[in-house]
Amino acid sequence: MAAKKSPIIELFRKFYYQIRNHPRVYVHITNRRYKIKESLFPKDPLISEIINSLRQNGIAQVDVSNLFGPKKLDSLTNWVREKESELEIDKKKSFFLNYGIFCPPFRADLNSNPFVQFYLEKKFLQIATAYLGYIPLLHTVEIRKTIPVGDAKPSASQKWHRDPEEKRILKIFLYLSDVDLGSGPFTYIVGSNPTSKGPWSRRFPQKLPHGVYPDANLVEKFTQPGDLLEATAPMGTIIFCDTAGLHRGGYATKNERIMATGFYTSFKYSEPPPGFTAKKVKGQVSKLDEVREIVSGN
């Protein structure tokens, strides 16, 4: 969440971000160096289906084996098992235990970390680039275990919220354990992504560059059957989501949840990873190998 400034600065920032985040300005001016033609990507029916679902609903789900084959999950779950003794409590959200949080540049991790390799897969980069409209930065890779909190009240990201800064944000979640209602499933209001055309796209809008945490009772007041997607699903489920839409998750009451997250954003994101300086891209990028290098921050 972007840090708040003085009232005068906040007023200026509001005006600035209204212009900056207009869809045409954001893609064609702010991120013009990073534009890439979607037509350059190979045609894949499943990838097209995911992109279309993101555009219409803000969310899509698929089993990891459908995208990457039956063996992809093995290396990821093996890594998690090896790190089980090294878990650390998250400094900001005490209901999380961290297996690892990784930021670019990923030079040291590319050959040794299966999750960094996973989130730099070409199919993910095709989806992220096509949905966002420009070559994104893989901002963060997180692997976390959610601790059951019993009857404690939801806090932080367990509450309904929209992420800050962008009108389009892509996060790709991977369930590394079976997730039921007691495990704190990722929950999304379908069609609440700001660039969709449904009524939820305009309810409880972001206060750019900040997000928003609307009152749960007000959200429930407007919720109709079919609006809510509670992503209860087996291990190996991938969730693609525009988290500028209304969502919550991690409110585990009975069972642990293990989940990886890849966060794709603009190189112009106002809160870059620690110590990162965006690489300047000259001209049109047309090869996915080059896209992969750029997205990794190397």
Placement of each model-derived feature along the sequence:
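Active-site region of the double-stranded beta-helix
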Residues: 134, 162-165, 176-185, 191-193
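Short edge-strand/loop segments of extracellular domains
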Residues: 147-148, 189-196, 264-269
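A short secondary-structure junction signal
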Residues: 139-140, 153-158, 170-171, 182-189, ...
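Double-stranded beta-helix
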Residues: 34, 182-245
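Short, conserved beta-strand element in jelly-roll/cupin
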Residues: 165-181, 232-233, 240, 263-266
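Non-heme Fe(II)-dependent double-stranded beta-helix
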Residues: 5-158
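Non-heme Fe(II)/2-oxoglutarate
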Residues: 2-14, 18, 25-29, 36, ...
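Histidine-centered catalytic micro-motifs
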Residues: 157-164, 246-249
